[in-house]
Swiss-Prot record:
Belongs to the TADA1 family. The keyword Nucleus applies. It is found in: Nucleus. It comes from the Eukaryota. This is Transcriptional adapter 1. Keywords: Nucleus, Transcription, Transcription regulation. The gene is tada1. GO terms for cellular component: nucleus; SAGA-type complex. InterPro entries: Hfi1/Tada1. Probably involved in transcriptional regulation.
Amino acid sequence: MATFISELEAAKKSLSEALGENVKQYWANLKLWFKQKISKEEFDIEARRLLTQENVHSHNDFLLAILTRCQILISAPEGTGSLNSATKPGKPKGKKKISSVRQKFDHRFQAQNPLAGAQQFVSRDPQEDDELKLCSHTMSLPTRGQLEGRMIVTAFEHGLDNVTEEAVTIVTCALEKHLKDLLTSVVSRRKAYRLKDGHFRYAFGCNVNPQPYLRNSVAAYNQLIECPPVFSSPTGAPNSGSYIHPDDAEQQAALLLACSGDNLTASLPPVNMYDLLEGLQVHREAIPSHTVYALNMERILMKLWHPNTEELQQDEIHRQRLAAKDGLLLC
């Protein structure tokens, strides 16, 4: 792995020296290509425009180093075998036999596979290499290689030289936790839940709902002791007062059931864009960055928009005019 890191740093240094003052423009174009704002051909054209004819190879070497770093396809060459002598130790020495030239040559030469030390590549579908797939297209979390590639480009854009494996692991865990917070903000608007220590939400979708017409139902929920019941606790333990007896826990459960309504809530439809919009509007702290929040709210509102009948008719008329102009007939 250290070899690929040194190769990437060397390729980046060579490319930066070849670009000179155009290095910021190159990082901006690289970021646009990773975001799929421009195609690979457009990125290559801009790179050739910023580089001279003698330094175009630096652009290719840098892209190859990034792809090699992200893929991490390192294949260790197999052993070449032993070249020890054919004579066995401990064998009584007899009369020395003169071997022929052919026997000496067979003993010294061992055939080797010329591709044994070559790097192995996984075969891919040709259609997968045509476009860069993003998370918004695949509807799945990015792989470790994709996330590391994005982090490398961002690091180069801010003047950093490299990205460590620990940083990629931290960003992966942070991404998973952020998505869990978004799901919690959406589900908490649809299902009832309980609180632990006044802030931790759990037991989503519990069937026991407070009965608003009973005065003691609110008190039963507010005075609920959130502790796991145990049969016995050691005397003198520091947390012995926080445990409750199983009989007390059973009495609390019976009281909650008696203070709850007899009608269960109907099953809800799947989560849609309206639920996501409401969850982000109520729980504004789910996305702390105002720029990211505004951009995602705009995307959600665009997904909720749909054309009316007049707009559909105008679109059909426009398509017919384009087809007539091109000499095509619509069936």
